[in-house]
Amino acid sequence: MEWSTLTTIFDTSLAVVFTWVAYKTGQIIWKYTPYSYPNARIRAMEARLLTDQRFSELAESKSLQNFVVSLEDTDYGKRLTSLQSYNIEDVERALDLSLVDVIELMVKIMPKRIKGLFEIMLEEWDVRNIINVVKAKLSNMPPQDFIMPAGKMLQKVKAMAEAKTMEEMLVILEGTDYEEPLRRLLLNEITLQEFELELYKVHYSKLLRYVNSRKGEEKIIASEFVNMLIDYTNISTLLRAKLSSLAQEDIRKLIIPGGTLSKSTIEAMINSEDVVMALGELEGTKYGEVLREVREAVESGNIESVEIALRKYILRRMKELSQFYPLSVAVAVAYLLQKESEVRKLKAIAKLIEDGVKPEKIKEMVGELA
């Protein structure tokens, strides 16, 4: 074989190798680089999460005003320092809005290919606001008092609050995913509880469609997260329905499509004799081990213990994924879950202080939350 031929073959081989290396390098850069800045920022935010010692100190607050002042040097300071008064409703709203601020930040800093997850998560506030406005209207209460300034449809929600009739509210929602449930409510085809459920079904279906349209690690992580949220909601709803002795057919209407639980497991829970038997049907699922620990609490009618155990499980799982995929959306989701837990604890402390509960009891009660 001539030397020129060998050179040509060698050059061609090198070109193929370099092209492959460039392609793989490009893939790695596309896959991981967009997460470098946001995840570094989130890790810094994680360092500012409140410690158990800080929660203990907050529980010692003599009043709501002391509680608020103690949080002024934290990430909650921005919202809390703007309060005009120190009543529990305003404090809770400020804490909720601090959580909204975090989700909005995720929308801004996360890669375009996954930011839609957080945009849809913000839409849950649209669902809450619409439900609150409708309930207020039907109860002849001022709907403006129940609107949280959050979500993507805030202007429509405010217009609904100003509407003089329910029919006007329906016109305002025309063309949205929430128009049909409200129409059915006005025609008395569904109850107010079913209307609320329909809106949440719309919300979770949006989340599912979005995560299922992702690729690679984003799909793996986001899909597991959303399906666990649906499992959490279905388990909580089903157990509470069982505790209230709701008819099996009525319970079936409450189940949100999706999740990791099989149809046979859901059906077995629905057909079970009581709430403890329903809980037992989860023994063979991934939630079986953590729920086994709260069986006694459920026997006494404490469904909140199940919800706490499930929230802890979901957070632990997302933390595991954030360690396995350090440059991924798992870091943001795990942080958001920690922030939700923190806000939940702060709201509980604030309410207990308002109710005059002793500090030691507050520490005990809040320590059990997640």
Swiss-Prot record:
Highest taxon in the source lineage: Archaea
Keyword Disulfide bond: no
Localization per Swiss-Prot or TrEMBL: Cell membrane
Bilayer disposition of the protein: Peripheral membrane protein
GO cellular component, one term: plasma membrane
GO biological process terms, semicolon-separated: proton motive force-driven plasma membrane ATP synthesis
Presence of keyword Repeat: no
Matches recorded under Gene3D superfamilies: ATP synthase (C/AC39) subunit, domain 3, V-type ATP synthase subunit C domain
GO molecular function terms noted in the UniProt entry: ATP binding; proton-transporting ATP synthase activity, rotational mechanism; proton-transporting ATPase activity, rotational mechanism
Keywords: ATP synthesis, Cell membrane, Hydrogen ion transport, Ion transport, Membrane, Transport
Assembly and interaction partners: Has multiple subunits with at least A(3), B(3), C, D, E, F, H, I and proteolipid K(x).
Similarity comment: family membership: Belongs to the V-ATPase V0D/AC39 subunit family.
General function of this protein: Component of the A-type ATP synthase that produces ATP from ADP in the presence of a proton gradient across the membrane.
NCBIfam families according to UniProt: AhaC, PRK01198.1-5
Protein's name in the database: A-type ATP synthase subunit C
Originating species: Pyrococcus abyssi (strain GE5 / Orsay)
